[in-house]
Regions:
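Hydrophobic secretory-pathway targeting helix
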Residues: 1-50
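Structural detector for short beta-strands of small beta-barrel domains
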Residues: 47-73, 113
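Extended, hydrophilic extramembrane loops/domains of integral membrane proteins
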Residues: 99-137
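Transmembrane alpha-helical segments that form the functional core of multipass membrane systems
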Residues: 143-147, 155-250, 257-270, 274
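Juxtamembrane helix-loop transition segments at the membrane interface in multi-pass membrane proteins
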Residues: 207-216, 236-247, 281-293, 342, ...
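Pore-lining and gate-forming transmembrane alpha-helices of multi-pass membrane transport proteins
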Residues: 217-222, 252-269, 315, 319, ...
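Helical hairpin unit composed of two closely spaced alpha helices linked by a short loop
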Residues: 272-282, 286-332, 339
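Hydrophobic alpha-helical transmembrane segments of membrane transport and translocation systems
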Residues: 311-314, 323-325, 329-389
Length: 389
């Protein structure tokens, strides 16, 4: 008993040491990603201007022109600088309205606003009021989310927070710049997704068999989703310009970008989260079954995994459908309001692209579930010792 106690105590200590080491490595990776330049810092607009936060003190709406629900013209506001070089000073700010409901805003006294200040030394030339200042609220929301994860899931929650910010940094610092520089979106999209998947799963599981099982299961589904997106995009004649704001890239000096390939890569990236989620669910379920019943046969372990997979797939495919439908709700309302036949709706290129997103992701889930169950049942029943995890 003393020998076994010492043995498992050593195993626990080794596991804690590995988790601590992996946590340190994660922090280093996050730090490196934060410091990596994207290569597009020189393209920043208003480099000769100061960006700051201001408070609206008073508004003059006499120059606004109302045309139905649309407003154009300019709003002149008295403002007070809350940050930046001119903090504490008061000045006049201009809010230009172009008649776009999605872009225009009407400020009121007391609003906190993001402003761009053009100046010549200590002399202010002009102040453009850009948008409501939302950074503080977004930061509070992110911190509340991170705190909830840590309180609820403790160590795993902390690692989940790391994985969340790691994903953001990989997308913003690596994937997006590579796409803008013209690298193959399909190849580098897969590499980026594989890297993120491995790092996220390693943060959740550490380095053990569960990592191998969930990674292999996830990548099988992601690869299948990517393959299906390539085939369907070509078969349905979908151009990448269906992506929101993508066409503007072509008019901004990036006319050599292959938007269709970027669309194919976006399907892979979009499906990776749900695929990874399903793979983790099945991996953890099979591991718990075998850990609590070490004598279970391989076939029964695989069957248990398949049962979990079937139940999870039923909701995960619906999750994808709801997620993509939610982004298209206004478009669907427009089609219905105009009396557009369902035949024409389904044949629309934007709707077809969302169908590819949904079906390719669902096929990825369908591929992930049985393969993960098969791999988990095979690997976890090879040894009787399941205390390592």
């Amino acid at each position: 008993v003393r020998f076994l106690s010492g043995y498992f105590g050593k195993r626990t200590a080794d596991k804690a040491k590995k988790n601590f080491l992996w946590g340190g490595v994660s922090l280093i990776v996050l730090g490196i990603l934060l410091l990596i330049p994207t290569g597009f810092e020189g393209a920043l607009q208003f480099q000769d201007a100061v960006k700051c936060k201001v408070e609206v003190l008073d508004c003059d709406n006499s120059s606004l022109i109302d045309t139905g629900i649309i407003r154009t013209g300019q709003q002149i506001c008295k403002i007070k600088f809350l940050s930046g070089k001119f903090k504490g000073q008061e000045n006049q700010g201009w809010n230009m309205l172009s008649g776009s409901l999605s872009q225009d805003k009407i400020f009121r006294p007391g609003d906190k606003v993001q402003a761009v200040v053009h100046h010549d030394g200590e002399k202010i030339i002009s102040v453009n009021l850009i948008d409501y200042f939302r950074l503080e609220g977004e930061l509070i929301l992110a911190m509340a989310f991170a705190l909830f994860l840590v309180i609820f899931a403790r160590g795993i929650g902390l690692r989940s927070v790391f994985s969340f910010f790691l994903t953001i940094l990989v997308l913003w610092k690596i994937l997006v710049p590579l796409f803008l520089k013209g690298y193959n979106p399909i190849l580098f999209g897969l590499i980026a997704v594989a890297t993120m998947t491995f790092l996220i799963l390693a943060l959740v599981y550490g380095f053990d068999r569960r990592l191998l099982v969930s990674f292999c299961g996830s990548m099988s589904g992601i690869l299948f989703a990517m393959l299906l997106s390539i085939i369907c995009s070509k078969a349905f004649h979908i151009h990448g310009a269906v992506m929101h704001n993508s066409e503007a890239l072509l008019y901004s000096g990036f006319q050599d970008l292959n938007l269709t390939w970027i669309f194919m890569a976006s399907v892979c990236v979009g499906a990776s989260g749900s695929v990874m989620d399903l793979s983790v669910d099945i991996t953890s379920a099979v591991h718990e079954v075998v850990a609590n019943a070490p004598e279970i046969s391989r076939s029964r372990a695989i069957k248990s995994g398949m049962n979990v997979a079937r139940a999870a797939m039923g909701t995960m495919t619906t999750t994808l459908l709801l997620a993509y439908s939610g982004t298209c709700l206004a478009m669907l309302m427009t089609f219905m309001a105009q009396g557009t036949p369902v035949y024409n709706i389904l044949n629309n290129n934007v709707v077809a692209s969302e169908i590819i997103n949904t079906i390719a992701g669902s096929f990825g889930l369908a591929m992930t579930a049985p393969l993960t169950a098969l791999i988990a049942g095979s690997l976890f029943t090879k040894k009787a010792d399941f205390t390592k995890a």
